[in-house]
Amino acid sequence: LLKVNLIGPKTPETAAVTHPEFVRAITRILVERKCEVWIGDSSGGAIAGISPTGRSFVVSGFERVAMEEGAKTKNFDREGVIGVDTSVGKMYLAKPLFEADFIINLPKLKTHSAGIYTGAVKNLFGCIPGLRKAAYHKGAPNPKEFGAVLAVINEVVNAGLHIMDGITAMEG
């Protein structure tokens, strides 16, 4: 499972999402090694209760990369959840995370208002499907509390490899 950064229906030129050519290169390496590759995430930025993840896969270029390279997209908003008891309460994470043999986290190099720089850690927040992310943001309103939530998600998800896309960094 390639866990990309798919914040919303953004093109790669915005530097808001993992660059699709970066994802393509990693997908090719894995497909050459006979791996079944999934490209997955749940977008942020839900408006009026509608998550834009499906549209985000198209606009970002991930849908095209998956089709051209023999991978599958996994829209975490539509794949179901698994409830996990954690030190910060019960968390509901996307089911593909528990079905994948191996998780590669592909964050985007960018800053974030909740922590200045979050590196690979913040990207796994997208493992929380759909509108549930807003509730976690609300329940952890300051950087210290939000950081604790991110740490727990990273413990549970346990990505085996983190490779950051720094093709174009984003600030703000």
What positions do the PLM features span?
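N-terminal and secondary-structure boundary signal
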Residues: 1-172
